[in-house]
Amino acid sequence: MDDDFDIPAGDDMMMGDGMGDFGGAEGPGMKVGEENEIGKQGLKKKLLKEGEGWDTPEVGDEVEVHYTGTLLDGKKFDSSRDRDDTFKFKLGQGQVIKGWDQGIKTMKKGENALFTIPPELAYGESGSPPTIPANATLQFDVELLSWTSVRDIAKDGGIFKKILKEGDKWENPKDPDEVFVKYEARLEDGTVVSKSEGVEFTVKDGHLCPALAKAVKTMKKGEKVLLAVKPQYGFGEMGRPAAGEGGAVPPNASLVIDLELVSWKTVTEIGDDKKILKKVLKEXEGYERPNEGAVVTVKITGKLQDGTVFLKKGHDEQEPFEFKTDEEAVIEGLDRAVLNMKKGEVALVTIPPEYAYGSTESKQDAIVPPNSTVIYEVELVSFVKDKESWDLNNSEKIEAAGTKKEEGNALFKSGKYARASKRYEKAAKFIEYDTSFSEDEKKQSKQLKITCNLNNAACKLKLKDYKQAEKLCTKVLELDSRNVKALYRRAQAYTQLADLELAEVDIKKALEIDPENRDVKLTYKTLKEKIKEINKKDAKFYSNMFSKMTKPSAEESKA
């Protein structure tokens, strides 16, 4: 395979003075025979034959063309076709005249166009003796045969990627994904230092050298590339001694690597802490996923890390296992993972103890020891989503909101504040838009909104999400400006956010409305003590500062 990343410069006659002005491009939908101006310097393009697809080459790509160049009087001065030899150059690098750089980047594969290039974008006042006179306008009949993308993927010149075979679709692997690749790594003299006909690794963990992980993140499935790798992305200043089948890499050696991304398994990190890992073994259908409250049908096999099977449901002669999400029917990690799956998907889910059986032993088909990480293979056979607001009429929305509120209350009493918060959020969403409600329905809706947002604010305070607690209380006060609970809870949130002035405003207003409220009075007392303490600290700080400013220096004392 050709390892050369230096693109041929072509005939001397074709060399330009610089990269040129890249303004302007082909307008959309040019028809055969139509002529358009590109940019504002007089470059014209006439379409002779349409190309394929929509892609056009980019700056840095190696393009391959056939061309015939003529003066305006029709006199031919050069032709690759006459030589039966295609011409290659690197687009946008000043290897050709400016008119070529600007014009060819508007072409599609297989396209044939006639470019009329003014002197300013060709050879100018000097011309190119003896064939091209000074100030000559030139015409080039150009056919774009193909191009090869060359990308500086590290953005520092450390890794250049040349695409040899385009991949499928548009997705690229991410850090958590497991990729399967084939590669051959060589020194610049062609010595093979490492080779594999198939190896799997997690992108963020890397393999062989840093260049492989960086490269695969830019590749599509089935893509084949040639990498030119500087030492900092290879084996660095130290190099590598020979080991097993791997050859030695000298210090500060550059590498050339053939790399093919055969496939990869998508790994999703679930949850704010990203501790639940879902690896897709079989892709699913469509884009729909279950929502909270959906009834799902699954096949599951639960294993310990040593491979011991402790649970198997829905396989062989068994009916598929059915449960309702977000109802604690299964362990939390499995519940969360299923919410991230599509119908027909098969996934391997790795769940740490805090989202599995915790620090207690669990007796299943086999014993799950305390603090065990468990692994589930899950197939989502089907699901029926819980109804959303748009699925319901007005009376059903109010009824559903009331039901979710009661579910939230039960969860709150059990100390399950995060799950309770979600119930209150869903209840509020059912009645968020009430413009079509009757007057009686609007009254019910208003009261439900107040209750759900107040209760949710209580959840957020328990969860230490003080900013959200403040926002929820503000929503309540927009509906009922004299709501004591909303003022009281917002004051609590402001206090935790160290905004004591706003907290004092709210608590004073709450006391004006309900002077005998014990909780409000106690909170006001605590708040005043905090403010007093802060004022004391501030006074001491400023006193010390002013004392330093007014204290005479040693020289002044002597005087």
Curated annotation (Swiss-Prot):
Reaction equation(s) it catalyzes = [protein]-peptidylproline (omega=180) = [protein]-peptidylproline (omega=0)
Keywords in alphabetical order: Calmodulin-binding, Isomerase, Repeat, Rotamase, Stress response, TPR repeat
Every PPIase FKBP-type domain range? 60-148, 176-265, 293-384
An annotated Gene Ontology molecular function: calmodulin binding
Biological process (GO) annotations held by this record are:
chaperone-mediated protein folding
Disordered: annotated segments: 1-34
Disulfide bond positions: none
List all Gly residues biased stretches.
17-27
Q: What is its EC number?
A: 5.2.1.8
Q: Which SUPFAM superfamilies match?
A: FKBP-like, TPR-like
Alphabetical list of InterPro entries matching this protein = FKBP4/5/8-like, PPIase_dom_sf, PPIase_FKBP_dom, TPR-like_helical_dom_sf, TPR_rpt
Start and stop residues of the TPR repeats: 401-434, 450-483, 484-517
Could you tell me the superkingdom of the organism this chain comes from? Answer: Eukaryota
Q: How does it assemble?
A: This PPIase probably binds calmodulin.
| Known role | PPIases accelerate the folding of proteins during protein synthesis.
Q: What is the protein name stated in its UniProt record?
A: 70 kDa peptidyl-prolyl isomerase
